[in-house]
């Protein structure tokens, strides 16, 4: 019987554990599986941790979640095909839930089986090499400070790529008298009440961190973009300007000549694909893009078909795309899907990369990733889900944000699994200061 190592028990790792569980429940024999998770619990990025910097064992804290974080996309677009929100909560819930609600949903799907028994918690993978047709993995039991090793036939890397921040350098940083932090360490917008906040970036983190700071009472929020502005109709107290030139004392000076008082600078400058636990020959090297190179179907490592990566793309689709990738990866491991020739693999990768390079706007990007996810869905037995409806929802969501960036979370969408329409939340997002699950689910 073959052995499979999975690194990471966040959403991607849980997806492939779930995929194997589906086969096992149908009476099929599955490989021996060991999942290594360096945190003390499962859920990955969705675990909130007050810590920043290092954990109690000296490892970097992987968590980037913060208080008052609400989903910035419709929950219907990430719904699991085999476990609906209606099933989990026993009723329809609003389309934009806070973090705790989504975490409860993610873990609810995997808590009922024996998936947890396959996970080694508080376990850090130190290094991995491929030798004699096996993956040799050295790992540390962090609680008992023991180093152990094991060998595996297949390796699935499901660590995500939103835990190692990219931190650029700007003139004047070393002498800036205020605070400089990456969004990875952002934990509570209340901390910046009455402050002049500079947010550097132009993607989802910058958008949400800036809105959070405004919502919870920042004196001003100035967003500095590098290439293209987000271009939303920002509420009072917020503005978007072109690219930070330098910090001069407590002033931020931008390329367009704007000068702004600054108490804190928050770097929403993205993350690195970082795999220090892999031998150099096994590492995926890419920036954040919709179709990383050298991955067949976005999953199988071109140079070694026993190495599989999950969730390494820039993302519109998330949980159900991870599931489609996981079902595909499972079937490759189980030899239910035969790998084509090297030439065919190369041709397929180049086709997707070439299409990605021609994308010009969010609608095209949504179409691209929807078609990619549908292709994976069609070649596995992942349960039925309406990806055309999800495509439509994503485009409506983008339109709602353009209409009003402050109120788009107050909209409702229909489930691609059950068809039920989400109710309107009892409190508009811009006025909802309590993000607890209890308050969200129960009308006051």
UniProtKB/Swiss-Prot annotation:
Effect of residue 226 to A: Retains 20% of wild-type activity with DMS as substrate
MF annotations from Gene Ontology: flavin adenine dinucleotide binding; N,N-dimethylaniline monooxygenase activity; NADP binding
Variant or mutagenesis effect after changing residue 72 to A: Retains 40% of wild-type activity with DMS as substrate
Effect on the protein upon substituting residue 288 to A: Retains 30% of wild-type activity with DMS as substrate
Keyword presence, NADP: yes
UniProt key word Acetylation: no
Cofactors: FAD
Annotated effect of mutating residue 314 to A: Retains 45% of wild-type activity with DMS as substrate
Catalytic function, reaction form: trimethylamine + NADPH + O2 = trimethylamine N-oxide + NADP(+) + H2O
Residues annotated as binding FAD: 12, 37, 39, 45-46, 72, 125, 315, 318
pH dependence: Optimum pH is 7.0 with DMS as substrate.
UniProt-listed InterPro entries: FAD/NAD-bd_sf, Flavin_mOase, Flavin_mOase-like, FMO-like
Pfam families registered for this protein in UniProt: FMO-like (PF00743)
Outcome (variant: residue 227 to A): Retains 60% of wild-type activity with DMS as substrate
Keyword terms of this UniProt record: FAD, Flavoprotein, Monooxygenase, NADP, Oxidoreductase
Stated consequence of mutating residue 314 to E: Increases wild-type activity with DMS as substrate
Positions contributing to NADP(+) binding: 70, 72, 170, 202-203, 205, 226-227, 288, 409
Leading EC class: oxidoreductase
Temperature dependence (free text): Optimum temperature is 25 degrees Celsius with DMS as substrate.
Subunit description: Homodimer.
General function of this protein: Catalyzes the oxidation of trimethylamine (TMA) to produce trimethylamine N-oxide (TMAO). In vitro, has a broad substrate specificity, oxidizing many nitrogen- and sulfur-containing compounds, including dimethylamine (DMA), dimethylsulfide (DMS), dimethylsulfoxide (DMSO) and methimazole. TMA shows the highest affinity.
Protein family according to the UniProt entry: Belongs to the FMO family.
The protein's name: Trimethylamine monooxygenase
Lineage: Bacteria, Pseudomonadati, Pseudomonadota, Alphaproteobacteria, Candidatus Pelagibacterales
